[in-house]
């Protein structure tokens, strides 16, 4: 299934954050049988697709951005260990750096944060070859799709702390947690409560259209 060819394509930058500086992104929702509609916010499109048994979301370039189906378990091997001294740095800095490290990229994340750049802006600038997705408003269950695709999910947990969701199973999620100085498991229901209380603020990323 793909969007109708007569519908306008996405314009502006391909940040995937629901709106671009020079235009508006459109996200197309399908069930297994039919086209269900178009949304301008990715989180709204995912919410609509998640209500379907086999819902999917695609963009104007026919890329699948989300599917309801995902593996029962997943783990991102590149992020299952943590270097010493991580707890001495801000969790925001360390999580951003860990994402870049996993893609063999380097940047002065500390300096960019000091300049007032947001996490979204830093990833858009430095994570070459990927489109960054603002998944704020999605549920934890919904964003686990990206972990299943082996892309970490950057998640706020409150009090200016963040973690990376790097794995999951039927009962737990695996967290790269700089504030704790460790990679550890958290009960899925507990994680839902923590992240919901923090506003369900998530980021992830998918290969840019030209990279696929």
PLM segments and residue spans:
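Conserved active-site-adjacent core of cysteine acyl-enzyme catalytic domains
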Residues: 74-83, 87-88, 92-211
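Short aromatic-glycine-(Arg/Gly/Cys) micro-motifs in beta-strand/loop hairpins
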Residues: 16-35, 56, 62-64, 69-72
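Short beta-strand-to-coil "C-cap" segments at the C-terminal boundary of structured domains/repeats
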Residues: 4-5, 67-70, 204-212
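N-terminal, intrinsically disordered, polar/charged segments of Gram-positive cell-envelope systems
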Residues: 1-23, 74
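Surface-exposed loop/edge segments in extracytoplasmic proteins
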Residues: 34-39, 183-184
């Amino acid at each position: 299934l793909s969007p109708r060819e007569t519908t306008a394509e996405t314009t502006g930058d391909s940040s995937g954050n629901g709106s671009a500086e020079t235009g508006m992104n459109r996200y197309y929702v399908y069930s297994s049988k039919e086209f269900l509609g178009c949304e301008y916010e990715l989180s709204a499109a995912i919410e609509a697709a998640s209500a379907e048994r086999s819902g999917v979301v695609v963009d104007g370039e026919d890329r699948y951005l989300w599917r309801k189906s995902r593996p029962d378990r997943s783990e991102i091997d590149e992020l299952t260990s943590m270097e010493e001294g991580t707890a001495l740095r801000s969790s925001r800095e360390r999580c951003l750096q860990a994402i870049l490290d996993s893609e063999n990229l380097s940047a002065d994340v500390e300096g960019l944060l000091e300049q007032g750049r947001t996490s979204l802006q830093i990833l858009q600038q430095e994570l070459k070859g990927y489109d960054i997705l603002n998944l704020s408003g999605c549920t934890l269950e919904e964003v686990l799709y990206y972990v299943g695709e082996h892309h970490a999910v950057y998640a706020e947990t409150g009090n200016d702390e963040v973690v990376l969701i790097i794995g999951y199973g039927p009962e737990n999620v695996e967290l790269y947690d700089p504030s704790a100085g460790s990679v550890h498991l958290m009960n899925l229901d507990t994680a839902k409560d923590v992240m919901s209380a923090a506003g369900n603020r998530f980021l992830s990323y998918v290969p840019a259209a030209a990279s696929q």
